[in-house]
Structure formats: structure tokens, C-alpha cells
Amino acid sequence: MIDQRLVRDNPEVIAQQLKRRGKSIDLTGLQLIARQQRGLEEERSTLQADGNRVGKEVGLKIKGGADPNGEEVAALRQQGNAIKQKVAVFEEEEKALSSQLRDQLLSLPNLPSPLCPDGKSEDDNVEVRRWGTPRIEEGLEEHWQIAQRLNLFDTERSVRIAQSRFVTLMGQGARLERALINFMLDLHTSKGYREVMPPVLVNTASLTGSGQLPKFAEESFRCADDDLWLTPTAEVPVTSLHRDEIIPADQLPLRYSAYSPCFRREAGSYGRDTRGLIRLHQFNKVELYWFVHPDQSEEAHQQITADAEAVLQALDLPYRVLDLCTGDLGFSAQRTYDLEVWLPGAGAFREISSCSVCGDFQARRSAIRTKDGKQTKLVHTLNGSGLAVGRTMAALLETGQQPDGSILLPKPLVPYVGFERLQPE
């Protein structure tokens, strides 16, 4: 959430930065609410000080021998009660304005970093680097074709069980998925991440704190009878691990690695990636998440991206890194690096991880602070996929194709999965 002080005192700065995102927003009304709320807060504070002064005066009068039931003390008490009533009215008005202000602030996206390249769409993203040599051959199968041939997952029965855009992993496919999850978690924990396995049902406050609500309500699955939602990413519950907390500065950075199933309605994606593992309502992902001191966030962004890249490098999967332009940034992000893995069968790079620095945007929504000496300030948060498991499997299937139809797996994965190749069962 954007700092309301910036809305009150420098709305033109917000307007300029949102314009970089391609959004023209008139903040005049929001600034007026912020100033009214601040004015009420100051008036209430003044009244409370007057009330405290009157209360002390009553005590001094009685201590000095005045009759507690006399007219002089009664007049002071009457004055104090009148002040209390005014304070209560101001508190209600201030509460209403604060709620109105927060609701509007929650709908505004994060302000892009000065380092973020300007642009309107994904066409303006900047390629930063590449790793590995993409395999380019004629006649290679796409991952869903390989999966059908090797009976790695079943989509038709999944429609019967649920609906379209679900898969049931079978046999070697299920085993490979489990192996990838364990491989990723082991790799990250070996680098100092603390593994967590959070709830996959989260409340509205958690989704709001991480930035999914109110904007992405239509993208999410919600329980009918409870204030619970199926989490779209482990970023949501991990953000709320420290909601409403003050983290001692000497404990930062906190680095978590979390596996979870993820659930997304994928509204607006009708007709896209209808076959295979690329775009599903339910998928597995290993998430990386950092809580850092504000001075460390840029360095941390480079490191969390490198940690996601390490998975692709360990599996020998060629990829490229894109610095997303302002017009393609996610709602909560200040700056984002996308990792796109090469899919030889499809002949294209596809996103497999987004690594974002969010500044204090999520921390302000979730009231996550740190204390360094006497000073309390908001932490900065970062998140990244490390990695999306289904898309990693898709890349492995297409990259490991052999002339005999088998799929050769990377050597580091063999101890986890128990075999070197995927073959017809």
C-alpha cells in the first residue's frame, strides 16, 4: 500500500509514477480525504490534551481542599465530559475517513522502481542475460504429447473429477513431480532458506496484506461458508507469517522457502494453453520469500533471482532473464525479473519464475515492521518462484527427448526420482 503521507503531501509524485505504469488517476479526491483525516486527527489530539489538562486540574483542586461535590469541581467535570463527547465524535468521523482512505489506497498498485525500464507491454521488457544453449531441432514433441505417449498424466478423467484445466499425475509423472518439489526445497534450504509448509486456505486479511485483494478477487477460489480462500501462491501465507509483528533488526534478513499447491481461476485466459501443464487451475510451486531491512532490498533482489536461476542451472535447462517494464509489472511489485525457460518442443521461451522486490508495499498493508535501536520502520519484502513445478516438468520433458522416445533426466534429479529415464510403462 502506498504511504498515505505521500497522498496527502505529494500526490503529483504518485500520479507521475502511476503514469509510468500506464495509469492516469486523478488523486484530488483521495488527497482531500487524507487531509481531512489528518485534520481530524490533529483536532482530536488537541481535545484529548485539553481533557487530560482538565482531569489533572480536578485532581489538584480536590488535593488542595476543594469540595469533591462542590460547584467548582462539578463545573470542571462537566467540562471534561463535554470534551470526551467531542473526542468520541471526532474518533468516529476519523475512523470513517481512515476506512475510506484505506479502501481507496488498497486499490492502487505499487509505484515502480526508478531502475525499472519504462514501457507499455511485455514487448518492452528488457532481456538482461541468457544461460545455456537452447535446443533447436525439427520434429520434437511438446510436453503434453510426450505425457500422453508415456501416460504421465490424465486430463480426461480429471475433467470428470473436477473440470477442465486440471490434471491427475500418474505413475512416473507423479513421481517426477514429487521429486522436483523435494529437489527444489533441498537446494534452497542448503543455501540457508528456512523451509515452511503453510496453510493452503487463507483468510481475507492475508490476501489483502500480500496485495491479491481487492484487485484479484475474480481470479481466486473462495469458500462459500467461511472467510477462507484457496491460496494462489505461497507468497500469501508467508507474507502473513509476520503480519502485525515487529522483527528485531538483528534477525533480518528472514529467508523462507515454501512448497504449496496453488489455485487460480485464470479468468481471462480462455483458449490459451489449453493442453498440458502450462496454465492450470491447480499447480504446485516452491516459493522463495525474503523479509529484509530497507537498505538491503536491491541487493536481495539480485540474490533471490540468482537462487531461482540456480534451480534451472542445476537441471541444465536453458533460460533467459527479463527485466519487466513498468507496463508489465505485477500489482505489488516495484521491479521484477522474469525467468523464461526454453521449451524445445514448443520452440519458445515460457515464464517459469517471477522474482519481485515489493519495497514496503506489502509490509504497510500487513503492518510488518523492524526495530533498529529506538527507530521502528517498515521492512521490505521480496518474493520469487523457485520454481513453478509443472512448468519445470514441461521443460524437462521437452529438453530430455531421446531418439528412442525416452526422456533423459538431469543427473542431479536421478537420486530423487529413482531412475535415469522416463519410458513407456
Swiss-Prot record:
Residues annotated for ATP binding in this entry: R264, R265, E266, E351, I352, S353, S354
Enzyme Commission code(s) on record: 6.1.1.11
Pathway it works in: Aminoacyl-tRNA biosynthesis; selenocysteinyl-tRNA(Sec) biosynthesis; L-seryl-tRNA(Sec) from L-serine and tRNA(Sec): step 1/1
Keywords: Aminoacyl-tRNA synthetase, ATP-binding, Cytoplasm, Ligase, Nucleotide-binding, Protein biosynthesis
Subcellular location: Cytoplasm
Amino-acid positions noted as binding L-serine in the UniProt annotation, renumbered to this chain: T233, A234, E235, E287, S385
An example Gene Ontology biological process: seryl-tRNA aminoacylation
Domain-related comment: Consists of two distinct domains, a catalytic core and a N-terminal extension that is involved in tRNA binding.
Subunit structure: Homodimer. The tRNA molecule binds across the dimer.
Name the UniProt record assigns to this protein: Serine--tRNA ligase
The organism of origin for this protein: Synechococcus sp. (strain CC9902)
